[in-house]
Amino acid sequence: MHAEEIIRSIEAEHFKETLPTIYVGDTVRVGVQIREGNKERTQPYEGTVIAKRHGGINETITVRRIFQGVGVERVFLIHSPRITNIKVVRRGKVRRAKLYYLRDRVGKATRVKQRFDREL
């Protein structure tokens, strides 16, 4: 067995099969497993997907939201065991693969139009 085949077989064990189709511009709610002391809980993080990076097991999404007037971005490894669930709240209609321009916008200018032709 070659090294590439070994890596692919290990990655296949950790792949999550039941993920929704996520597009840039979508508003998603990501459930993140958090440890506080000796307790574990799921913390929801809701925001707009501004970037998506493909790469098999290393696939990531960058989610941006405004919290107390400050823009907060988090990068999530989609296949990470810390991600308990991902739910698409609404579909967004955009013409770009990366929405980094939203970082410079304030208030209502950061809104993304809703798209109705794709299923949630």
Swiss-Prot record:
Statement: the UniProt record of this protein carries the keyword Ribonucleoprotein: yes
GO cellular component, one term: cytosolic large ribosomal subunit
Organism: Acaryochloris marina (strain MBIC 11017)
Any GO BP annotation: translation
Pfam families cross-referenced by the UniProt entry: Ribosomal_L19
MF annotations from Gene Ontology: structural constituent of ribosome
Function: This protein is located at the 30S-50S ribosomal subunit interface and may play a role in the structure and function of the aminoacyl-tRNA binding site.
Keywords: Ribonucleoprotein, Ribosomal protein
PANTHER family according to UniProt: LARGE RIBOSOMAL SUBUNIT PROTEIN BL19M (PTHR15680:SF9), RIBOSOMAL PROTEIN L19 (PTHR15680)
Family that this chain belongs to: Belongs to the bacterial ribosomal protein bL19 family.
Record InterPro entries: Ribosomal_bL19, Ribosomal_bL19_CS, Ribosomal_bL19_sf, Translation_prot_SH3-like_sf
Protein name: Large ribosomal subunit protein bL19
Keyword Ribosomal protein: yes
Lineage: Bacteria, Bacillati, Cyanobacteriota, Cyanophyceae, Acaryochloridales
Family matches, as HAMAP family: Ribosomal_bL19
